[in-house]
Amino acid sequence: MGKYINPFTDWGFKRLFGQEFSKPLLISFLNDLLVDELHVKDLTFRDKELLPPTKDQRGIICDVYCETDTGERFIVEMQNRWQPNFLDRTICYTCRSILDQVDKGRAESEDAYKFLPVYTICFMNYMPRTDEVSKFRTDIVLADKDTKMQVSNKIRFIYLALPLFKNKAEECVTDFEKWIYVLKHMEALSRMPFTAQKEIFKQLEDYADSHRLTKKEWEAYENSLWVVRDNMACMAAAEREAREKGHAEGRAEGRAEGRAEGRAEGRAEGRVEGRAEEKKAIARNLLAMGLTIEQVAQGSGLPIEEVKSLQ
């Protein structure tokens, strides 16, 4: 096990962002995420009965009421686990959070539909599908299609695809970039960077230090860690199956065309390229699971240097 916990296990995520003692971490992260937009002064964790009612939703959402230094209030939902139909689910969870605020007993009243804005922040610690997001940070707001002008601040989605964040430690300029670097690489770090530049990273180091966990905390963390690895393994298997099916269909089509056109060389190149891309996809998922460079190289069949280039 590494020196620091994996922040994307349910237990690790809750320890760093979902506890009263770690509120300063969450406030600092939100302020760096939304820098130059608003400044969170305080936050309150929402009542447990307001959290998702079904088993597959629990553990993936951290719900908080936030208040800015200008008196504005809004709700933040933070999600950190992949699920099927991920984007659709985030929309449903956000709409649920809005509907929970509507006073159903006063539906005819104008005040019944005055609700706090809901910001949904999603950590995607896996390679996004091509039909989801294509860059590290994707901000979605309600805006006019033609003018691009925002028409309401009531709903906002921020998707953070960590595998698409490529900055090295020395390339991180903003505090937000430093946060993302630390969270992405935390489990593999031997020391916490940026502690001399910002005090909050010293607090993060204290709470994330795996050697400070009690026996009970360690057992809970270890169980949560296995859940993450099982989920990642299932994702990798599903993607591998889909690729193999696609490659088989492509090879069959290529053979048919090759017989007709004599393109044996093209078929061979296609098979080689397909296998190479499959190995890279497997390596990316293994990296997202927190495995070491050597373990990923062994599991994917790629050279160590090529695995390093995928980080």
Predicted regions, residues:
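Conserved single-residue anchors adjacent to enzymatic active/cofactor-binding motifs
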Residues: 1-225
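Short, charged alpha-helical interaction segments and adjacent helix-coil junctions
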Residues: 2, 74-79, 180-311
